[in-house]
């Protein structure tokens, strides 16, 4: 059997490594470099270039040169508005999917990524002198289910069996801690790359690498800092000459390369000159762009980006349930951590000098290679325990999201819960699978939907539908639903057809905090309506069963209170619903007392209305939750 290689498939650059004996080795590519630009170019003659060769010709061939494709992996066209503006190449809407159009041919992001992976695969094969068919590929910790699946698909297109998808900060921790297996440390991995930011808190000890929490922003990286410089120099030139350089693809590509170069230079210098001769021309002649950019100015125009790294850090430390002083090391990963302001922010936030002992460009690939060695059996006494970054659940009564798996749960994991129907004689249920942190289903991301049919007709709350969530070691979700009475089962593997945008996934947690009061109020309104609905249902049922035993005057008053609650339920406020419920319950208390004294069905007289029937209260026994499912009328088919 051949080697399992480790690949860091980055937004800006990619890297490949392999275990050689007990040590990981980063492999140089055919140009003699240890990292390869994640760039693919298509020439006018039809040749395909990957890596440095593609990057070199980008200025003269911007519309046919693809970079930062990782930002489009596993995403729909309507989710990539901002990224689309930054790309000089053509992005099209292909049946809702974001695709790249080159010379009248359409490519999926997975296909473009596969071309980069093929370059990594060939690099490893040249080094090892043997065919490579298996790999461990890294992804940002905050990549969602669709993006992870898209990464696996890219590997498959490249001719690789992806043995494991591993989170980038976790891979970095593996590389950092491989020679410290007997030590016990709490480590924060601060990973700021070309397109994404992750922060993970891990506990290392006796060969166990346990992720305690992870957070991040999948729309924050070196590309965004480059864009700040592009916008700054373009606006300065526009002030001087009245021309917006960003409207021409070739000029925009020149600006991008100049911005990236300036950013890198400002990591070691206090200022840099951006000099682009013959950047454009007017009737007066050629125009040249010459702008001096200081580090202070760069930090000022990028202030909002620098500030964005702090909130994920705060959440990660809080969710890890540790004190800041307990963190022993802060390991910097990703090329963007070379920015002095980032290093200063990390030092200020964590109260200690960041650890720069690992190569930020190579450490993730090294960690992936180590994981490959673990899977192969070449590396022993290492156990990796990772987590899922966002909560997973289903929609239940009233549009509430009921979580089955909480964020930062160790994976692989399997959770199940029993739900029930929301209507009498309901013969089919729809399971609406969600990912996110907001209380309401509509505010979270739909991962998929599927139906379970042929449920025997029964009063609502009686059928028992067991929903099972199963996350594998790659962080990919499998969901199934089973009717416990008939044993009939339906399942779904959440595929890459349902995707989150890079901005959305981080926005979920931010919104959960910013709109906490609004969410709480909306959830209370739903809970009250659910309770009112249950009280109406049980009152109607018991009126039918006990009608003749209830005194006429009290029955009339009860029916009046019931009508009042029905009206409040349809048209009233939360307060009016509460008032009507109190009135109806008061009527029942009086009737229950009379029935008890007469011995006529006192045990049945008081209907029990669940207080939170939309999320966790029982209706029908066996801990079943009233779930809002779509009723399918089979007669209309």
Curated annotation (Swiss-Prot):
Composition bias, Low complexity: 598-619
Alphabetized GO MF terms: ATP binding; ATP-dependent protein folding chaperone; unfolded protein binding
Cystines in this chain: none
Keyword list, A-Z: ATP-binding, Chaperone, Nucleotide-binding, Phosphoprotein, Stress response
Induction record: By stress conditions e.g. heat shock.
Assigned protein family: Belongs to the heat shock protein 70 family.
Name of the protein this chain belongs to: Chaperone protein DnaK
Source organism (scientific name): Chlorobium chlorochromatii (strain CaD3)
């Amino acid at each position: 059997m051949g080697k399992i290689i480790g690949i860091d498939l980055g937004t800006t650059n990619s890297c490949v490594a392999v275990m050689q004996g007990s040590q990981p080795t980063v492999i140089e590519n055919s140009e003699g470099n240890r990292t390869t630009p994640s760039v693919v170019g298509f020439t006018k003659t039809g040749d395909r270039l990957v890596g440095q060769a593609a990057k070199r010709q980008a200025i003269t061939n911007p519309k046919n040169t693809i970079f930062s494709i990782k930002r489009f992996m596993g995403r729909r066209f309507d989710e990539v508005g901002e990224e689309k503006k930054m790309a000089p190449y053509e992005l099209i809407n292909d049946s809702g999917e974001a695709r790249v159009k080159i010379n009248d041919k359409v490519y999926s992001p997975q296909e473009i990524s596969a071309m980069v992976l093929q370059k990594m695969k060939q690099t490893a094969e040249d080094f090892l002198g043997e065919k490579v068919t298996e790999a461990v590929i890294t992804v940002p910790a905050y990549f969602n289910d669709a993006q992870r699946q898209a990464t696996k698909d890219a590997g498959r297109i490249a001719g690789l069996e992806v043995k494991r998808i591993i989170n980038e900060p976790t891979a970095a921790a593996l590389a950092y801690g491989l020679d410290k297996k007997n030590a016990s440390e709490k480590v924060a991995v601060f990973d700021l790359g070309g397109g994404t930011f992750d922060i993970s808190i891990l506990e290392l000890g006796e060969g166990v690498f346990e992720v305690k929490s992870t957070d991040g922003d999948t729309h924050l990286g070196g590309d965004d800092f480059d864009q700040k410089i592009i916008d700054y120099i373009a606006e300065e030139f526009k002030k001087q000459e009245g021309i917006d350089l960003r409207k021409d693809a070739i000029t925009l590509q020149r600006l991008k390369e100049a911005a990236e170069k300036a950013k890198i230079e400002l990591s070691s210098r206090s200022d840099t000159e951006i000099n682009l001769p013959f950047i454009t021309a007017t009737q007066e002649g050629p125009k040249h762009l010459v702008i001096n950019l200081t580090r202070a100015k760069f930090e000022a125009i990028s202030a909002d980006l620098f500030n964005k790294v702090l909130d994920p850090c705060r959440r990660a430390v809080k969710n890890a349930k540790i004190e800041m002083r307990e963190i022993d090391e802060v390991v910097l990963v990703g090329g963007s951590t070379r920015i002095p302001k980032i290093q200063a922010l990390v030092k200020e936030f964590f109260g200690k000098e960041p650890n720069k002992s690992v190569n930020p460009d190579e450490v993730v690939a090294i960690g992936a290679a180590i994981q490959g060695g673990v899977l192969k059996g070449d590396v022993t006494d290492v156990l990796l325990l990772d987590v899922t970054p966002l909560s997973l659940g289903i929609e239940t009564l009233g549009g509430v999201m009921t979580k089955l798996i909480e964020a930062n749960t160790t994976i692989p994991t399997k959770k199940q819960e029993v739900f029930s129907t929301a209507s009498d004689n309901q013969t089919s249920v729809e399971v609406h699978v969600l990912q996110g942190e907001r209380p309401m289903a509509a505010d979270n991301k739909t991962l998929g939907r599927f139906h379970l049919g042929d449920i025997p007709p029964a009063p609502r709350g009686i059928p028992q539908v067991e929903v099972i969530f199963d996350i594998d070691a790659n962080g990919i979700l499998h969901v199934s639903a089973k009717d416990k009475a008939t044993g009939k089962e339906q399942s779904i593997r959440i595929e890459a057809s349902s995707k989150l945008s890079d901005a959305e996934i981080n926005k979920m947690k931010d919104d959960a905090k910013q709109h906490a009061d609004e969410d709480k109020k909306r959830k209370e309104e739903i809970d009250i309506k659910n309770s009112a609905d249950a009280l109406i249902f049980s009152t109607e049922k018991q009126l039918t069963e006990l009608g003749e035993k209830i005194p006429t005057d009290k029955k009339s008053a009860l029916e009046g209170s019931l009508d009042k609650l029905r009206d409040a339920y349809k048209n009233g406020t939360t307060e009016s619903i509460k008032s009507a419920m109190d009135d109806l319950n008061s009527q029942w208390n009086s009737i229950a007392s009379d029935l008890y004294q007469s011995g006529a069905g006192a045990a049945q007289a008081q209907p029990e209305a669940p207080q939170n029937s939309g999320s966790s209260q029982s209706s029908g026994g066996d801990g079943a939750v009233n779930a809002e499912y779509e009723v399918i009328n089979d007669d209309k088919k």
